[in-house]
Regions:
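Structured alpha/beta reader/binder surfaces that contact nucleic acids or chromatin modification marks
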Residues: 2-172
Length: 172
């Protein structure tokens, strides 16, 4: 059984991903998996450009997450003017500006800091994007719950708040 990730994304951002405008998805957490790994895109509602299927979401495509950047804040926390948001390389502890990441994520510095609430986050890099010709139902996927004995499969009944582990789809 191969492990992948099912990630919930709002229609506005799904449309930007589908049009290749958005190549990084920012999240507060990350999977405990080595890159690269497969991600299935669950669009939380039907967007006009994505087929407008109603109030319930669908899985619209998939991508490979080939890299994850650690987004952190350096400076005096609690004093926004003295804090700088940076990308940190966990191996070397060297930092770099977030400008390129913000552009690729279609975010402003304010949007990023509002979302992360001045905490750390992760930039999931999107590569090998594939948008499905026909959307898929959430029920077609099998979730994986971590237990002390390994991954336990379960039927997904509702979309994850942010993301969850799933089995790689059978038809692949």
């Amino acid at each position: 059984m191969s492990k992948a990730v099912l990630i919930s994304i709002r229609p506005k951002w799904c449309e930007k991903i589908a049009s290749s405008m958005k190549t990084i998805e920012v999240r507060k957490t990350r999977p405990k998996m080595n890159t690269p790994f497969k991600c299935y895109i669950y669009c939380t509602q039907g967007g006009v450009a994505l087929g407008a299927w109603g109030k319930h979401g669908k899985v619209i495509g998939e991508f490979i997450c080939d890299r994850i950047d650690w987004i952190t804040h350096i400076g005096y926390t609690g004093i926004p003017n003295l804090v700088e948001t940076r990308i940190c390389d966990a191996a070397t502890m060297r930092t770099s500006p977030v400008g390129g990441l913000l552009n690729a994520a279609c975010l402003t510095p304010k949007m990023l800091n509002d979302y992360l609430a001045w905490g750390d986050g992760y930039g999931w890099h999107i590569s090998d994007l594939r948008i499905y010709d026909e959307t898929r139902e959430l029920s077609e996927f099998t979730g994986l719950r971590n237990t002390r004995f390994g991954a336990e499969p379960y039927g997904i009944k509702r979309a994850p708040q942010s993301w969850c582990y799933v089995e790689v789809a059978r038809d692949e």
